[in-house]
């Protein structure tokens, strides 16, 4: 991590002491679970995406997250306005380029958003490989590439765009183009619950709002909290249905000691 005196647990404590308002421009599938994940973690989500107000709302939020899962021309206008406002206000923002490789509209839209210099990019391995110009095996919104194959692409992407890149999957990888960490944990049931990855993007935004001066630390902390909650929930259930609500309970029950004792963060 960038700052060895900052732990994931201490950032969770700081976030809950001053819950950040996070504008989550996310897809229709993810809105409900993402809002619940944010509330369980201790943040304040706002699912505001309309072009007419997205920029104004971004200016008063602690952070912005943009997810292109259910993209349209109107949504893109709102995303662009919000990102511009976040930049002007000095607020961190996170880009989640969901299945950007799938259509020309998505590719053009992500290229436009990248020009606005996201603070953090979070995606699965296939998305990150393709975003760096490689050939991925993504199928729709699902990754068919292991995280390990995306690590080099993540470093290149971080260096090119001067951003933090997080590749999430069975094991997560986070880099600023120089330093890097792996985060182990979670549960094999997590990919069977829709929109958990999209929800993680929102949580990254919440931690970034808490520590805007150290987005690498913030990203690692968010992923560590998610992994510990997923691992705890996975030990209590037999399938994805019960996992979804157990995960929210586990996330709400996390505290500083639990994360710092159970998180498996490996600095590379």
Curated annotation (Swiss-Prot):
Cofactors required: Mg(2+)
Pfam families the UniProt entry points to: HK
Enzyme class: transferase
Residues binding ATP, per UniProt: 122, 168
Binding site for substrate: 47, 195
Entry's transmembrane regions: none
GO molecular function: ATP binding; hydroxyethylthiazole kinase activity; magnesium ion binding
Isomerase recorded as keyword: no
Pathway given in the UniProt record: Cofactor biosynthesis; thiamine diphosphate biosynthesis; 4-methyl-5-(2-phosphoethyl)-thiazole from 5-(2-hydroxyethyl)-4-methylthiazole: step 1/1
The UniProt record lists the keyword 4Fe-4S: no
Gene Ontology annotations of biological process type: thiamine biosynthetic process; thiamine diphosphate biosynthetic process
Catalytic activity, reaction form: 5-(2-hydroxyethyl)-4-methylthiazole + ATP = 4-methyl-5-(2-phosphooxyethyl)-thiazole + ADP + H(+)
Entry's EC annotation: 2.7.1.50
Record keywords: ATP-binding, Kinase, Magnesium, Metal-binding, Nucleotide-binding, Thiamine biosynthesis, Transferase
NCBIfam families: PRK09355.1, thiM
Function according to Swiss-Prot or TrEMBL: Catalyzes the phosphorylation of the hydroxyl group of 4-methyl-5-beta-hydroxyethylthiazole (THZ).
Family designation: Belongs to the Thz kinase family.
Name the record gives this protein: Hydroxyethylthiazole kinase
Organism: Rhizobium rhizogenes (strain K84 / ATCC BAA-868) (Agrobacterium radiobacter)
Taxonomic lineage from the root: Bacteria, Pseudomonadati, Pseudomonadota, Alphaproteobacteria, Hyphomicrobiales
Gene name linked to the record: thiM
